[in-house]
């Protein structure tokens, strides 16, 4: 998924927020066998550009700050996706197509419970969400996140 903006609370705990635009991403739904049934792991990897930073913190180009922002944004996205999945399970609807992933991965098992997927299985199916977020640039906020070749040469000298 790309082209949308993620806004999370300020990582320093104060007032304000940080916003990032997703420039590229990939989502994988991985069915697995767990405790005698089907479970899923949703893996999301995204590259983002910081578009707004309303927090008191060091420049985003510093590695520690960038890593902290990546963790905060990843955590926020993980919670939102997990909440969406919980809502769909409570509503007994499968708009993402988890059932189709289960059918492809475990066709014989799925055939035995296909008619009951929505009622009995999907609402109780464990789903783990993992997010890996990488900040590529800070846009106009503080300049590039990664040091330029010139900056690297200056550090070495």
What are these regions (language model features)?
Residues 1-157:
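Membrane-proximal alpha-helical signals and transmembrane carboxylates
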């Amino acid at each position: 998924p790309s082209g949308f903006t993620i806004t999370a609370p300020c990582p320093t705990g104060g007032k304000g927020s940080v916003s990032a635009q997703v420039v590229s991403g990939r989502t994988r739904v991985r069915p697995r066998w767990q405790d005698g049934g089907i479970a899923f792991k949703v893996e999301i990897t995204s590259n983002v550009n910081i578009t707004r930073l309303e927090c008191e913190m060091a420049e985003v180009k510093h590695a520690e700050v960038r890593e902290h922002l990546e963790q905060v944004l990843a955590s926020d996205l993980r919670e939102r996706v997990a909440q969406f999945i919980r809502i769909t399970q409570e509503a007994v609807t499968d708009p993402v197509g988890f059932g189709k992933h289960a059918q492809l991965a475990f066709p014989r098992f799925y055939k035995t419970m296909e008619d009951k997927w929505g009622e009995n299985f999907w609402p109780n199916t464990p789903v783990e969400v993992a997010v890996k977020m990488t900040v590529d640039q800070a846009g106009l906020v503080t300049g590039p996140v990664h040091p330029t070749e010139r900056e690297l040469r200056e550090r070495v000298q």
